[in-house]
Amino acid sequence: MPPAQGYEFAAAKGPRDELGPSFPMASPPGLELKTLSNGPQAPRRSAPLGPVAPTREGVENACFSSEEHETHFQNPGNTRLGSSPSPPGGVSSLPRSQRDDLSLHSEEGPALEPVSRPVDYGFVSALVFLVSGILLVVTAYAIPREARVNPDTVTAREMERLEMYYARLGSHLDRCIIAGLGLLTVGGMLLSVLLMVSLCKGELYRRRTFVPGKGSRKTYGSINLRMRQLNGDGGQALVENEVVQVSETSHTLQRS
């Protein structure tokens, strides 16, 4: 019993194809029936010099890829946003996951890129002023201002020298107290100003978020939602916009 045989259609060269590049538009090639068997096979023809497409099982039309390539170049306006023209043979140049990532990055834009937050130097300065003022005041009040010695055990000249020393020390401590109070005042004022500015910014941001812009929209996953003004009651509603499918070209090729 002869082995099971399959049939494959391959493109046969016409008389114009043998003449070389003098005929740019060759006649549509015919279809030739070729037998595939497990037994001794007939000698094959010499392989052409150009790139050869990989063999596939079933019926294969050799002129399909070339016609599709010409159609892509003749109709460039039919390609939609987010879909790239596929190379001959319907093989995509990038995997599907990478194309989806590129489309999401193009939709989101550079607004969602991670931005490093600057250090709040005003808040840090206010804290430094407050801590410095507290330390100065506490230190000035912790140091004694009078000599704690028995005047009977010390001579008059030594007692006078100690009094002069503590008088100068008291003046320096008073200056430290004044400086500490000044630092506390400056730190408190700066902290209050920063608090007021932050409250004003938060209020402005809250008003800005509640009032929808002209082209405001938000992206959730693969669905774009935007606000649209209704004609009747003047309210607002979320409208769903379909995202352009990146793999639409591949589905079209599979259906054809």
From Swiss-Prot:
Its main location: membrane. Coiled coil: none annotated. GO terms for cellular component: membrane. Residues 1-111 are annotated as: Disordered. The chain crosses the membrane at residues 123-143, 177-197. It is a multi-pass membrane protein. Residues 80-96 have a biased composition (Low complexity). Residues 97-108 have a biased composition (Basic and acidic residues). This is Transmembrane protein 74B. It comes from Homo sapiens (Human).
